């Protein structure tokens, strides 16, 4: 009798424990970003959510908050470190206070094209940067392309002297401030969500952005000219809170890491196509004149802005800059 009772208790306990496991709340990952869903980052966040919830049903729930709907670009880093959000994908200009080395991505005319950026990011030096902020509580999960930056303004920008005196919106980056000062323009820090209104009201006269940002934020409606300068890159590092990441069950962390790697490949594959598509949509809208620089004009811009490299060489490291330059040579 006691034997049967013990067996019954064991079975009941097993069912209870199983019920508790089944009823356990899923791990919630809040993924916050500041751009539209149509952009490479917006599409990447949605794909990450889809794949994670398919692969970890009931275990992990991913909530995506686009367009600064949860945190703006001035608050999202603090929110990540406080644990109020688990994944964000700030532009590479946003890490200045955590590591000076990531300023390398803001140096003007360092990379010839997005393929060179990709080669550097996949190099040992590029991958090392992903883990360079773990002592600050930040773990990098991957680089997502947004695209090469174009200059826009309400006057034609063909030569460096054309930018003189104009007010350009910049991210909070000392490198980008110096980039515009090099052509005697006036940099103005402004959050991404405020750029359209800033351009519309004349608080700023111009900006720098990839085609997808220009189109998705309708900047072409308030900018008469866009110069296809490809003078710099605006990419993102997808990051998480180190304590949160290390505290995840090992199997869950493994699935998330593998999924992020797959999504990164897809985002970076689609980014250039999306940018070119948005460029064409801007052309068809006929609200802005697209200016193509001659090789000689582009060389003038490069000559005017390249001295910025020397100003930040000590903080970034000459060897790291050389490694980035080497990525311009196709393998």
Swiss-Prot record:
One of its GO terms (cellular component) is outer membrane-bounded periplasmic space. Keywords: Periplasm, Signal, Transport. One of its GO terms (biological process) is C4-dicarboxylate transport. Disruption phenotype: The dctA-dctPQM double mutant shows no growth on malate and fumarate and residual growth on succinate. It is found in: Periplasm. It comes from the Bacteria. Induction: Expression is maximal in early exponential growth phase and declines with cell density to reach a plateau in the stationary growth phase. Induced by the C(4)-dicarboxylates succinate, fumarate and malate. Positively regulated by RpoN and the DctB/DctD two-component system. Negatively regulated by DctA. Its main location: periplasm. Residues 1-23 form the signal peptide. Belongs to the bacterial solute-binding protein 7 family. The complex comprises the extracytoplasmic solute receptor protein DctP, and the two transmembrane proteins DctQ and DctM. The DctPQM carrier is more efficient than the DctA carrier for the utilization of succinate at micromolar concentrations, whereas DctA is the major transporter at millimolar concentrations. Part of the tripartite ATP-independent periplasmic (TRAP) transport system DctPQM involved in C4-dicarboxylates uptake. This is C4-dicarboxylate-binding periplasmic protein DctP. It comes from Pseudomonas aeruginosa (strain ATCC 15692 / DSM 22644 / CIP 104116 / JCM 14847 / LMG 12228 / 1C / PRS 101 / PAO1). The lineage of its organism: Bacteria, Pseudomonadati, Pseudomonadota, Gammaproteobacteria, Pseudomonadales. The gene is dctP.
């Amino acid at each position: 009798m006691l034997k049967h009772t013990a067996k019954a208790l064991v079975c009941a306990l097993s069912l209870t424990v199983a019920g508790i496991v089944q009823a356990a709340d899923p791990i919630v990952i809040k993924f916050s970003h500041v751009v539209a869903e149509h952009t490479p980052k917006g599409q990447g966040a949605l794909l990450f959510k889809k794949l994670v919830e398919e692969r970890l049903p009931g275990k992990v729930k991913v909530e995506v908050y686009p367009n600064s709907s949860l945190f703006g670009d001035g608050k999202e880093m603090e929110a990540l470190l406080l644990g109020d959000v688990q994944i964000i994908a700030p532009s590479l200009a946003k890490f200045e206070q955590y590591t000076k080395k990531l300023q390398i991505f803001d140096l003007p005319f360092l990379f010839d094209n997005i393929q060179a950026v990709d080669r550097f990011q996949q190099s040992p030096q590029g991958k090392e940067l992903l883990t360079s902020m773990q002592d600050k509580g930040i773990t990098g999960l991957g680089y997502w392309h947004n695209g090469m930056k174009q200059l826009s303004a309400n006057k034609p920008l063909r030569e460096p002297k054309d930018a003189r005196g104009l007010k350009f919106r910049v991210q909070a980056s000392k490198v980008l401030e110096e980039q515009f000062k090099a052509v005697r323009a006036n940099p103005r820090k402004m959050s991404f969500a405020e750029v359209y209104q800033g351009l519309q009201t004349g608080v700023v006269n111009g900006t720098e952005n990839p085609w997808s940002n220009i189109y998705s934020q309708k900047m072409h409606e308030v900018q008469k000219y866009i110069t296809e300068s490809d003078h710099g890159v605006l990419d993102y590092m997808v990051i998480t809170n180190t304590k949160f990441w290390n505290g995840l069950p090992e199997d869950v962390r493994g699935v998330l890491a593998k999924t992020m790697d797959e999504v990164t490949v897809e985002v970076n594959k689609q980014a250039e196509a999306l940018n070119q598509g948005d460029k064409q949509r801007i052309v068809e809208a006929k609200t802005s004149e697209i200016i193509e620089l001659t090789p000689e004009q582009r060389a003038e811009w490069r000559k005017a802005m390249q001295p910025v490299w020397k100003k930040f060489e000590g903080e970034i490291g000459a060897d790291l800059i050389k490694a980035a330059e080497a990525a311009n040579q196709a393998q």
